Amino acid sequence: SRIKGVIFNQMSPMLYPRMKKLVEEELGIKVLGYVPRVEDCVIESRHLGLILPEEIPELKGRLLKLAEVLENSLEIEEILKLANEAPVLEYPLLEKTDERSLCQPSGTSAIAEKVKREVDVLTEMSQVYTWKSPKKLRIGLAKDEAFCFFYEDNLDLLRSMGAELVAFSPVHDGHLPENLDGLLLYGGYPELNGKALEENLSMRQEIAAAIKDGMPCLAECGGFMYLHESMEGMDGKFYEMAGVIPGKVWRTPRLTRFGYITLKQNQGISHGKQETAILGESDLGVSPAHEFHYFDSDNCGTAFHASKSESKRGWDCMHGSDHLLAGFPHLYYYANPKIPQAFLKKCLEYKELQK
């Protein structure tokens, strides 16, 4: 085992010495302390995970108190010593000669072929990572208590590709920011803010008009829900939403299609419907993704096919058009940078058309 040490969680101070002695004697693994249950520092959860930081009273005070407790219950010096013993990780880049030798047919041709495929993918992806828009693109980023789930890595990659992210609130702001070239509607808790979202009619109308006018948009999960005609809130009432996507969203009693998936763009005819290029691309490649939601839609889309690696289960999902990609799956852009690149290229086209 590569496990060099463990820390016990939610353990009582009375039990810790006995458990430490037992584990170290029987398993030969260092026990580096424990985290006791501190009632004043408990952070409650809800249907999609933790409460947001800004919703927690006295968060800084709780963290300071927890830090004080951990200074006494963790063996800090031993943890630092163990960390300093870790070897440096080295991943040398393959030279062209190495690539050829690795990929020559041999007794392990299957392994060689796999290495060649991975090298080809990395070479292709490196070209996408370095792409940058020749002009700065103003991209509206929905960011408030209703839309708060996003990966900072995704935002960093968009910035490195030339995006200026302009935050706005579909809950509180009456209008979209001026001179936008694209929209990002990520996940969050629209179901907890259904009434406020419905009452902000001007924002709903402006978002709908912008997308229908051709403004590129990426929408995930909560953002996808917001684009429907109506959405059921946690209070059981249905609220009017942006109306870009025909249909409604409702709450289910359990997590729906939960877990990791692989997305592949449907080609040609799907369910009797002719598929078109998505964000200007006929093939956006394969995208690892995940779904994490209690809600479902009567119009999930058919632009992509989702499959689960551990089973034969699969389903069609996501809406795709020349300027829109919207669905329940959450994407990680570094796993498939073709998607943010295609999105920003469409934003650049849109910017040029607005002159």
Where are these regions (language model features)?
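NTP-binding/hydrolysis catalytic cores, primarily Walker-type P-loop NTPases
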Residues: P57-D98, L122-M125, Y129, S133-K136, ...
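Phosphate-binding active sites in nucleotide-utilizing proteins
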Residues: P134-L201, Q205-A210
